[in-house]
Regions:
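Structured mid-to-C-terminal alpha-helical surface segments
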Residues: 1-52, 64, 68, 80-338
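Glycine-rich beta-strand-to-loop/alpha-helix junction loops that act as flexible
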Residues: 54-58
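Betabetaalpha-Me/HNH-type nuclease active-site subdomain
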Residues: 61
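Glycine-rich active-site/cofactor-binding loop and its immediate structural neighborhood
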Residues: 76-77
Length: 338
């Protein structure tokens, strides 16, 4: 099968240009999407493939075609059952995180490299993220039980220009703490393959993907938890508002607010596996949930939304004011659910 990278430079540039015209998204993003796709393909050939799950915002665009947003990161999980740890005590959760982190950084990282080479991919290097940089620029080792683990695939862009908001690297976040269900197998392909069928078939893969009903609820819960912090984040966070708005009128969004069992299972799972001191998990329940940014946060969130609209969305967008109106409407729907 053919891989985009195997074409001549002139052919690859022509394909990027045509895909840019079709999807109305910058060539830098088209190129990065190809790397996201081929990295996904290689990851789902690793030894944990049977327990590997594709989730998050990128799964909404690449797996389900539900959002018109370029998604640059790969969010994955491996079932805790894969590591043979079933109990949920604090000590067992710490043991699980340590065992999983060693496996991700030692085994998955090496297998990813091997699988990319088998596909014929060149011009990249893999970095296991083992240090954190604080606000003062000081580096410190990442904790041995840190979850998720982060692996970066740095690639050599064939384009002469770059965009600060879209660096030439694929960020892989892989966790051992996520739920296993509900999921469904989905076909993943690059923008190049969708523009020129058959010309990038080797990068295409079928991957186990989280069903959007769950992703929809998890995004609302993530925001509700974030806004319980004294100083909530805003950089690259407005995408969750965009995704919620895009999903709220779909069958998945409507079903999510009718499935009390799924709703409560996700809340319970988060309270056990993601427990953090600043979150009151009872506030995730419909009667109390709040995922609308506070007034003092609006300027920062509006700025982040503008950045996202400029670089990542390839369809018409709502104004920030209209987006907030829709999110408030959605919050009302949550409050009236069940």
């Amino acid at each position: 099968m053919t891989l985009w990278l195997n074409h001549t430079i002139d052919e690859r540039i022509a394909m990027l240009q045509r895909a840019e015209e079709k999807f109305r998204i910058n060539q830098v993003a088209i190129e990065k999407d190809w790397w996201v796709t081929v990295v996904l393909n290689a990851l789902f050939k690793c030894s944990c493939a049977d327990q590997l799950i594709f989730k998050g915002g990128t799964s909404l665009s690449k797996g389900w075609n539900l959002i018109e947003r370029f998604s640059e990161d790969i969010d994955l999980s491996v079932s805790h059952e894969f590591f043979g740890i079933e109990k949920t005590t604090k000590n067992q959760r710490e043991k699980l995180r340590k065992k999983a982190r060693r496996y991700f950084l030692d085994t998955v990282s090496a297998e990813l490299d091997e699988n990319l080479k088998k596909l014929g991919v060149e011009g990249y290097h893999i970095e296991n993220v083992v240090e954190e940089i604080d606000e003062d620029g000081k580096a410190s080792p990442v904790a041995s039980d840190k979850d998720p683990s982060v692996i970066l695939v740095h690639y050599e862009s064939m384009l002469g220009h770059t965009i600060e908001y879209i660096p030439p690297r694929v960020k892989i976040e892989i966790s051992c703490l996520s739920m296993n269900e509900p999921t469904e197998d989905r076909l993943i392909s690059s923008y190049i393959e969708q523009t020129f069928p058959g010309e990038d078939a080797a990068a295409t893969a079928t991957v186990r993907t989280v069903v959007p009903t769950r992703t929809f609820l998890e995004k609302a819960f993530l925001l509700c938890e974030e806004f319980q912090k004294q100083t909530p984040r805003h950089v690259r966070m407005s995408r969750h508002l965009y995704d919620l708005e895009r999903l709220m009128d779909t069958g998945f969004g409507k079903q999510a607010l009718q499935d009390i069992d799924l709703y409560e299972r996700i809340v319970k799972h988060r309270s056990i596996y993601y427990a953090v001191g600043y979150v009151d998990y009872s506030k995730l329940m419909p009667s109390e949930i709040d995922f609308v940014p506070r007034q003092e946060l609006m300027k920062d969130w509006e700025g982040d939304y503008a950045e996202m609209c400029n670089h990542f969305i390839y369809d018409q967008t709502l104004s920030f004011e209209k987006l907030l109106e829709r999110i408030k409407e959605l919050q009302d729907r949550f409050r009236k659910a069940f």
